[in-house]
Amino acid sequence: MAKKLKKNEEITKKFGDERRKALDDALKNIEKDFGKGAVMRLGERAEQKVQVMSSGSLALDIALGAGGYPKGRIIEIYGPESSGKTTVALHAVAQAQKEGGIAAFIDAEHALDPAYAAALGVNIDELLLAQPDSGEQGLEIAGKLIDSGAVDLVVVDSVAALVPRAEIDGDIGDSHVGLQARMMSQAMRKLSASINKTKTIAIFINQLREKVGVMFGNPETTPGGRALKFYASVRLDVRGTTQIKGTGDQKDSSIGKETKIKVVKNKVAPPFKVAEVEIMYGEGISRTGELVKIASDLDIIQKAGAWFSYNGEKIGQGSENAKRYLADHPQLFDEIDRKVRVKFGLLEESEEESAMAVASEETDDLALDLDNGIEIED
């Protein structure tokens, strides 16, 4: 009996070795035909973290879980009209440029305001802009930019405005059932692999429509078919809530609106988190406002009555004065921002220390130059 078991084990081992050898040969052939990394064991990539780029909003970075938009993925931003969708996307453009990247904006709606984009921090001289004549042209331009591997972020505004060529050439009133959905489905199939390979972030802004005859459930839907919903790694629902009134002479005027950004789909972190931000008219998301609120909740900024203080030093009476103080002191803003990110696990402690050390060295070098009588150019 023991001999029989031993023989069976030897046969199993022999077949196992043969199968392993056959697998190794197959992997070598695949690598030869399709390049290194075409097939790999999942464990080889298990240690790799998802690469992200900040959204330009601290609250949204926290809600996204990973610390920003994942690179090499498709993002969909949708919501009602004038809810702040383009503003959220433009903050991503500004952030990409801030990190030294190249951004492109496919303006299918032909409605981009350069002055507003510049106010949000976008370098309009460096921004690549396309205003396509048809949906196919817009998606083809996006595809060529992504394939180049030189662009870090592509924004398409909006999916609803990507009109198929056949619809443009036809008459108003002609029926074109499913034409846009088929166009988007084909585009997603072509673009998804290239987006992942080049680590480009592709943001698609979308509008809302209502399904006719829906009695129960949510009647809202987004145009362009189901393909974008499936291919998107992150979907953001942007909704304006209440108006923000001004102070003093502007107390009767609306100077902005409180906005909720809900992460309705997230493939890289837990979904359904909500970011609450203030979008100020002509300025975009109030970064100082969200920092004061979040840091106060974490007790990084201490609040006593109407006064806000940091490390025992008062920074303002009332949130508006605290926001103004942080805006005037960018180094302090960055320091508090880093501490908040460490608290939420978006930044390693070592990264924070190293970033602070670099800032400290720069300050020390500047002080040394001044002591030595060296002139500092503006």
From Swiss-Prot:
Gene Ontology MF term list: ATP binding; ATP hydrolysis activity; ATP-dependent DNA damage sensor activity; damaged DNA binding; single-stranded DNA binding
Function: Can catalyze the hydrolysis of ATP in the presence of single-stranded DNA, the ATP-dependent uptake of single-stranded DNA by duplex DNA, and the ATP-dependent hybridization of homologous single-stranded DNAs. It interacts with LexA causing its activation and leading to its autocatalytic cleavage.
Family as reported in the entry's similarity comment: Belongs to the RecA family.
GO biological process, one term: DNA repair
SUPFAM superfamilies per UniProt: P-loop containing nucleoside triphosphate hydrolases (SSF52540), RecA protein, C-terminal domain (SSF54752)
SMART domains (UniProt xref): AAA
Coiled-coil region: none
Name of the protein described by the UniProt record: Protein RecA
Phylogenetic classification of the source organism: Bacteria, Bacillati, Bacillota, Bacilli, Lactobacillales
Annotated gene: recA
Domain of life: Bacteria
InterPro entries linked to this entry: AAA+_ATPase (IPR003593), DNA_recomb/repair_RecA (IPR013765), DNA_recomb/repair_RecA_CS (IPR020584), P-loop_NTPase (IPR027417), RecA-like_C (IPR049261), RecA-like_N (IPR049428), RecA_ATP-bd (IPR020588), RecA_C_sf (IPR023400)
GO cellular component assignments: cytosol
